[in-house]
């Protein structure tokens, strides 16, 4: 039976029909459009709702990711202590001193795809069943491992999310990789959450769309979103049923941070 998940993001769950089915999803967009904020927000809100989270961090150390999340008042350290939130550190060995690794789960090489997958499985075993698995980012994996290895990894990650009824997200930066490679990843995932910048009447806005969610063809249309001190919020749609607009969102209202990082 396919498990269904809420992201907790303001406006997003209503847009996709309240819940997303288990599967592997690609988060695709240009630099600084909000991809990392999107997955960080999902990670925090999932743990807050007592859904297990495994966060594979290749673009920064776990400490750096936690610092960025705290900019939005998303503190995951209490969930780490309760084994509800596990980082898999694929960054520190490559870019910092190995002795500084603080995560229980880590990998020493991004070219050993089998090892990376096995460590993710170990981390997920500790958090429990279902839940969320985040890879941030697939672009960094491609920089270290050849395309075929990265594709094999995504095949393995897809199998893992299906076997364990997880919701998987892999972040990929557009403009960094050949179109053939991007299309190959689009082919293997269950859906694509695409983000972009758009210029309308000299005003730059952020837009999002969802490709590959069954018959919800209206999700192919671009929808505006903003990055606020509370995280990502989707702009209201005129055609949304009124009763859906009245559903109370589970996103808490954190204190306004001193600064935000739009990555």
Regions found by a protein language model. Name each.
Residues 89-91, 137, 212-214, 236:
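Flexible glycine-/small-residue-rich
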Residues 6-18:
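Pre-Walker A adenine-sensing motif
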Residues 17-20, 45-49, 77-80, 122-127, ...:
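Conserved catalytic network of the ASCE P-loop NTPase/AAA+ motor domain
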Residues 52, 83-84, 129-132, 163-171:
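Loop/turn-to-beta-strand initiation segments
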Residues 166-167, 171-231, 239:
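Phosphate-binding/switch region of NTP-binding enzymes
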Residues 1-2, 217-263:
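C-terminal regions of RecA-like/P-loop NTPase motor modules
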Residues 15-89:
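Walker A/P-loop NTP-binding active-site region of P-loop NTPases
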Residues 94-156, 162:
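Phosphate-binding/switch loop-helix module in NTP-utilizing enzymes
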């Amino acid at each position: 039976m396919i498990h269904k998940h809420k992201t907790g993001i303001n406006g997003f769950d209503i847009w996709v029909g309240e819940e997303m089915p288990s599967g592997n999803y690609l988060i695709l967009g240009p630099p600084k459009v909000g991809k990392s904020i999107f997955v960080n927000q999902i990670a925090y809100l999932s743990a807050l709702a007592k859904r297990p989270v495994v966060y594979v961090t290749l673009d920064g150390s776990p400490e750096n990711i936690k610092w960025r999340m705290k900019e939005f008042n998303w503190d995951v350290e209490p969930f780490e202590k309760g084994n509800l939130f596990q980082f898999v550190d694929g960054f520190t060995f490559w870019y910092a001193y190995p002795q500084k690794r603080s995560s229980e789960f880590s990998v020493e090489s991004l070219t050993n795809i089998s090892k990376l997958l096995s460590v993710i499985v170990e981390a997920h075993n500790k958090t429990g069943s279902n839940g969320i698995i985040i890879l941030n980012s697939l672009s960094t994996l491609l920089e270290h491992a050849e395309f075929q290895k990265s594709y094999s990894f995504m095949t393995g990650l897809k199998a893992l999310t299906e076997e364990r009824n997880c919701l998987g997200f892999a972040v990929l930066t557009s403009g960094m990789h050949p179109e053939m490679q991007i299309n190959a990843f689009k082919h293997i995932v269950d859906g694509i959450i695409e983000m972009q910048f758009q210029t309308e009447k000299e005003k730059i806005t952020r837009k999002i769309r969802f490709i590959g969610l069954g018959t919800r063809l209206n999700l192919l249309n671009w929808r505006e979103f903003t990055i606020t001190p509370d995280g990502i919020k989707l702009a209201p749609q005129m055609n949304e049923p009124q009763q859906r607009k009245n559903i109370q969102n589970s996103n808490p209202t954190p204190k306004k941070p001193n600064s935000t990082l739009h990555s």
